[in-house]
């Protein structure tokens, strides 16, 4: 893991088109801004983990294809 120190209003670049900027530091929290291509998906880690868990759960469910077939006929 690369560890960098930045002050408020300083930034780092990831490649040539992703910039992460420290917008401010207040009450022990760091506020960051991310400038990246529009199509790039960016999530907070806890949200990303939740999405992964939901996808795993959904992939393990047994689907009754007959019920699905009925739904599409409506």
UniProtKB/Swiss-Prot annotation:
Signal peptide: none annotated. GO terms for cellular component: cytosol. It comes from the Bacteria. It is found in: Cytoplasm. Keywords: Bacterial flagellum biogenesis, Cytoplasm, Repressor, RNA-binding, Translation regulation. One of its GO terms (molecular function) is mRNA 5'-UTR binding. The keyword Magnesium does not apply. SUPFAM superfamilies: CsrA-like. The keyword Cytoplasm applies. It holds the Pfam family CsrA. Disulfide bonds: none annotated. GO terms for biological process: bacterial-type flagellum organization; mRNA catabolic process; negative regulation of translational initiation; regulation of bacterial-type flagellum assembly; regulation of carbohydrate metabolic process. Homodimer; the beta-strands of each monomer intercalate to form a hydrophobic core, while the alpha-helices form wings that extend away from the core. A translational regulator that binds mRNA to regulate translation initiation and/or mRNA stability. Usually binds in the 5'-UTR at or near the Shine-Dalgarno sequence preventing ribosome-binding, thus repressing translation. Its main target seems to be the major flagellin gene, while its function is anatagonized by FliW. Belongs to the CsrA/RsmA family. PANTHER family: CARBON STORAGE REGULATOR. This is Translational regulator CsrA. It comes from Alkaliphilus oremlandii (strain OhILAs) (Clostridium oremlandii (strain OhILAs)). The lineage of its organism: Bacteria, Bacillati, Bacillota, Clostridia, Peptostreptococcales.
